Amino acid sequence: MFRGKGQQQVSSTDNIKAMMTAAIGNKLEKRLPLVSTIFVVGNDEEEFNIERRTLWQDVLPDLQNLAFQSNFDLEFCDVPLENGELTNSVAEHVLQMWKDNPRSWIVLLLGNRYGNVSVPTSLRKEEYESIRSSIFEENGNVRVFEKAYTINRNGAVEEYRLVPSAIKDKKQLAEIIKALQAGAKAAHEEGSINQVHEQRQNRFFSSPLETFVRSILQVSPCRCLFLLRKFDQLVADPNSPNAFLETNDQNSRKIEDLKNEITLKMNDRVMTHVLRPESTDINYFFNSRDGDKYREKIARQFNEKLKNHLADINPPVRPEPPKSPMVLAANEARTHQEFLENQLALGNLKRDYDKRLDELASVKVNRGVFLIQGTDLCGKTQALCRLYHKISDKDAYKVIFFTNLTYSSNFAHEAWRTICLNICSISNIDPKEVLEHFKLGGILKSLEELVQKADKPVCIFIDDVHLLKFGHLLSQIGRRTETAPDNLSLFMTSSNVAPVNAVFAVTQTVNVDVISENEVVGMVQKMAEKVDKKLTNEQISAIRPLMAAKDGILIAKSFTHEILFNGNSSMKGGMDGRMTRIEKEFGKLAVGNAVKFIAASSHGLTRLEIHDAISADREVLEEMNMSIVYSLLTLDGIIEALGPILRKVIIDDRQIIGIAHSGLISWLRNRYLTSSQDIRSAHLQLSDLFADLLIDNEQSPRHEIAYQSFSQGIKRDNGSPNFRRLRLLWYHCLHSGNLDRLKELSLCHFEYVDYVTRYFGISHLLSLYEECATQILHHDLQVISEQVLVPALVTMARDSEQLAAEVIGRLRFTRHENSHFLNSLVDQAMSWVDLYNRQPLLVPLTCWISPPATKVCRSFTLKDWKPGNTVLTLSANHQYILISGNQSDPGVIYAYHIASEQLIGTFKGHTAAVTCLCSSNDSSLFVSTSFDKTVNVWVFSQSTPTMSLTHHTAKVTCAILTSDDQYLITASADSSAKMIKLETGEVMRSFNDHTGSVVSLQLTSNNQFLITGSGDFVVQMWDVTNGKCISRMGGLMAPVSTLAITSNDAFVVVACEDETLKVFSTVGGQELHELMGHEGKVNSLVCAQDDCQLFAATKSKVFCYDIHNGQMIDVLDTAQPFPICSLKISSDNYFLISPCGPKVTIWNVTKRNHDAHDVHADKEGFLTAVALSNDDKYAACGTNNGIVALWDLEVCQCVFTTIQNKGDPITCIRYSVDSQYCISGNQAGCILILDAQNGGVVRELFMHSSEVLSIMSLVHNKMISCDIQGKMVIWELFGDDDTPEMVATGVKPPIFVPPTGRIMVGHCSLSNKEMKIWAFPEEGPPVTRAKLSHSDEITCFATSPKGGNFIATGSRDMSLKIWQIDKGFLTQVLVGHENVVTCCCISFDERLVVSGARDEKIIVWNVQSGDMVCTVNTTAAITSLSMTGDSTVVFSTTEDGWVETWSTTKGRLLSTFNAHRPIKKLINSYESHRMLLLLENCAQLPILCLHNTPAVGVEATRRRSARAQSVSSASNEPVASTSAGEIKKDPILSSNNGGNAQSAPRATAPKPTFDMLERSKSRTSLIEKDRTTTLTQSNAPPPQKSNMCTLL
């Protein structure tokens, strides 16, 4: 019935161990990437136009869909389209690609034409000399033959290779063929080449098609589908060439013989079609009805046969299971191990550091951290790999890691976690400790523990450790000085010019010198040997001088590859020369487009992705003369020619083609992506590809051949995700600058985030946000990463299925403050839960988990900064800052990228300190003012000013730009302000009324009014259009230091030298109020765009005020002893940037509340009691300040609230048996009766003088209540007065009365070891029926929710006892716990009893036999237990805030939920579609739902719902609704019991969980006060109030 967590595990421990052992072993089985290529081969483009069109239009889309759904890439290569007439060189290229990939397939088209003879691509030396001699003897054209071939001495035997340029001219090609055939025939007749195989001899006279076919027929199994077409009874006119018919009789016989041979040998792979057109006009036939029938027939045949063949050569289609962390680590290990083997494949190259490596390999002696460093491309990686190889597996556990090799090898936290998990696997150590940690500090502590536990030394090898990134989310550890554990040897390579964070103190440093000439020669000779070739002495001599270059080793490898690939190399021009030759061979555009996409990608692309990205650009295709699609053969040739520039790695079963070295990426980007626009354009094209935006579903399938890109949908029909989209879409959206697409399609898209978490791990998901944080400063991404995902790590480590619950719970809490993208993420998470069916799932229906506050977003220290008066401005998109004030160089302006904290430029033009900086609204320019009396205008692309203005006669103090960036207003110590036209630098207007220095400027939003502040104690407002002063803001007692104006122009804030801070009305100029509480002089002011928050900067601190009421909201402390002279707020109103000395701090200022006020309010609203109605429709709760709230559980909203007694906590709450009334008791002894349907007060009783702890229903509308002093009162529910029916003492609460209302269970007041059962007769006082006892204190008791025959008691004596209620007989003593039993529950049918104890153990018992059904262990002491109505599921809550759901049959964990607070109590409905939690210190009512386990009713009165609760659409009207479900009577209850007269009506399960919930609802607090307004967004309506009654 249940699909528990056990089924989620992808592999058992043994399987993972085997996988890891294989990865760490000496030799790995070669993996084939999941890619199939279909080659369509025929004589030329025209002969099989109709068949090829059918393949393109009717077959390829279906095959692409099959491939996508089956998880393999499908490449389609139409050879005639790409290359025209078939030649031997093209045929050999196709054959080689076909043989290299066992998953490829050929569709071979043969018709009536035999094809033209082509020249061989190579001749053996003896063949060449014999033919040349014969041509000479026959007086043939020896010269044209000699020019066509050049000798290649690099093979095992010398041969002559065809020069490609020699056959480009058709006339010259005909002469070569004529001379070659004549020479070959003569040589054969003379006997000089008779020893050659007959087929080799015939190739001089055979068409490429025949040669190609015969090569295919020799391969077994033959992965080829033949279409044999014959036009019967048609004879071609010899004088009129025909694209479909052969004009040469001999060739006609050859093609017929060839087709007959194919039919005999490959009958099951042959499609034979004999067509009988009425004339030689074949095109007329194809346009006829018979032609349509032919086309439909071959389309069916192609579809059927190719689908079957592709299915045979590709793995069977299975849903991709989620990956466990251990499997992810094992997959990573395999990829790194395969790369290691490729590095070692060259063999043992002798280097001058070999002796040093031998010393390091003695791990029994050498322990510590060894740093191998050197220049780029000096062989550090090779040294590390050889060192790894030298250390035996018997002597140590070894793990090797290549930084940036895979998508999970970029960030330190992810890298070290993977390394630790790999160590666990190979050393058989339990990975539990590692799996619980995600932050680098905790991971490194786990590593130290692992190393100590290992029974052998642990050797870790990390390549390019300096490239590991340390993000601020999970990788912040600072500079560590700890020494490595004794059992650890850590070997790392690093550039000798880059800083290294080795995480442990470096023990030794090994320097790798630049590779010598002899070492390079040895390396390139090994390269040749690897492919069974050799280098001549002349070539080696030519390579030696290349080592003088900086990148000599790469040049040598590239030129060697060129020699081995082409047979020769000019060896000129270094790497640029090599690229130029490749461009000349394949076309500059063809090479440039392929390389730019590879260079733009993070780790590389598949060949299909490169092909599709280029094919989507129609303009580029036309420029390359490729009208339909980018040539796959050309692309393969380019990739092969690039050789050592590229590296190929198999990741996610795809071969990823990337740049081989980080140093090459910059070079290639500078060559092919020359501007930032080029880079963004490349990323945008790739984001289009992975967003699946290149698919044109409207494309007509009949009119023209057109290529549709391979699908990149997010998931397949079986639910498996598309790994390539998950890997790359976010990256290219980010770098294209399209942040809306980034959020909408990836990082704020729940399905995307969920898939990344499931298949790559949440640690990798956070790496994506880490990477974004190094590129952009963005609020939404920060919220998701820092306020949702990082706090959810503890939850996700325990239950990966809880991502949706965490997103819903945290982001719904702040729904009204969220952006559209964040709220969409919540909606998608709800919809995801709707469709979730993998296993039971706990989800929150209300929100109470507040996202953690992130006051400081980022801070960084400026290098070599001597603090002074630091001024700063922001770019329009708030990604860059311009800053000045470094006393070491006071006139210099520095530009920093905020996210990466990198200096990106300097601007020099001032001779004295800069006083102000301001940027244009489009970031095209910025303006600076200075003590040198100048105003400079700059553009970001130039380091010198474009304009320098000298209109002032004293220092220029500040400047401001109009909103249209057309005018600049400057202020100076010469007592004036001037308005300057930016385009010309001309002064348009002067403002000269001040008598002191003008120190601050502000403009109204319409640019009409200018506000100036001066040292003459005056603030003036000017009309910009005429330069006249229109008002003055007086009353100041000191010079003005700075000004600020709100964005709605309502208020002007003035700070003065006497430390005063005042708010003025802009309209009237009168002072409104003075702001108090700051310390010292205010140096800078800025108003947030919500027109409410004001930020005032003093020395080291920024004070935040509510500008409307003057209340101080927050204090931001930079902890630097310097004045803050500049404040800027981002255009999106999320971030405040403050420079203080050498430190720049970015603050999150989206909302500031007075914390003390909120804390007090929350404490008043803490819940103290909860109750669930018997029909499961309603809930009630009471708070610490005396509020009773009634909830409609169908919509999960509070519908009524009532104050019982203000300030007296509610201590108990209960519904009547018929669910019509809610009764609550409080600390003062008051009892309140509410009508549950309308919230109206029915009665208020004062029968107790102390805290009421229990209220229960009896028969005949009677109620019983019990207080903390043991006073028990029986009273009438509908009585006219407060006179109790009976008052008694001696009963200690809590008490319990079953729905029958005729007995009561309670504690004895005299002994905590005893309980009693009392019966209520028709007349008279209660009668003691039985006594229940333990040897120690009774800590808990339980009966069936409907009453029943048994009661269970738990005790400090660690036992559980089961008693008969009627007689008080002890039926079972259940012993199994090892600590105090804290809670217990009995199932509805009384078959099972469940107990929980402080020993962190839950035991399910059989009531009749007393046997243990199952036992489960938890992580903390159990606080409460409950069961579903059908007894199949038990819920447990723990002290550490977890709700866990267990199967009562097997004890399997079904689902968990983290409430993030200690849980006191859990109450669930019959089918657990609604669950109530009572948490410590929580002012909201947590309501949960359990999905996918509807209780199967054991009573006929219960009906199972059609499906579990959904989490989708919402009702906007939070009205109390009645269920439309069928209401049944409980046959157990009598029908004449007064208050209990109606049987507890139970409806069917509520409507789908979130169907009736209001999606726009944020948190619902149980107290809403009249608070003084703080922050209302000016551009959005104020947050909607809770639908509860407002309490004053």
Swiss-Prot record:
Keywords: Cell projection, Cytoplasm, Nucleus, Repeat, WD repeat
Tissue expression as described in the entry: Expressed in the nerve ring, neurons of the lateral and ventral ganglia, including the sensory neuron ADL, neurons in the retrovesicular ganglion and two neurons in the lumbar ganglion, PVQ and the sensory neuron PHB. Expressed in ASH nociceptive chemosensory neurons. Not expressed in ASK sensory neurons.
Comp. bias (Basic and acidic residues): 1556-1572
InterPro entries (alphabetical): NACHT-WD_repeat, P-loop_NTPase, Quinoprotein_ADH-like_sf, WD40/YVTN_repeat-like_dom_sf, WD40_repeat_CS, WD40_repeat_dom_sf, WD40_rpt
Subcellular location as annotated: Cytoplasm, Cytosol; Perikaryon; Nucleus; Cell projection, Dendrite
The WD repeat ranges on this chain: 909-948, 951-992, 993-1032, 1035-1074, 1077-1117, 1119-1157, 1162-1201, 1205-1244, 1247-1285, 1287-1328, 1333-1373, 1376-1415, 1417-1456
SMART domains hit by this protein: WD40
GO biological process, one term: response to alkaloid
Assigned GO CC terms: axon; cytosol; dendrite; neuronal cell body; nucleus; perikaryon
Main location: cytoplasm
Keyword Zinc attached: no
Matches recorded under SUPFAM superfamilies: P-loop containing nucleoside triphosphate hydrolases, Quinoprotein alcohol dehydrogenase-like, WD40 repeat-like
Record has Metal-binding as a keyword: no
Chain residue ranges for the region called Disordered: 1507-1592
Biased composition range(s): Polar residues: 1533-1545, 1573-1592
Protein purpose: Involved in the avoidance response to the noxious chemicals and repellents such as quinine in ASH and ADL sensory neurons. In response to the noxious chemical quinine, promotes dauer formation induced by pheromones such as the ascaroside ascr#3 in ASH nociceptive neurons.
Name by which UniProt lists this protein: Protein qui-1
Native source species: Caenorhabditis elegans
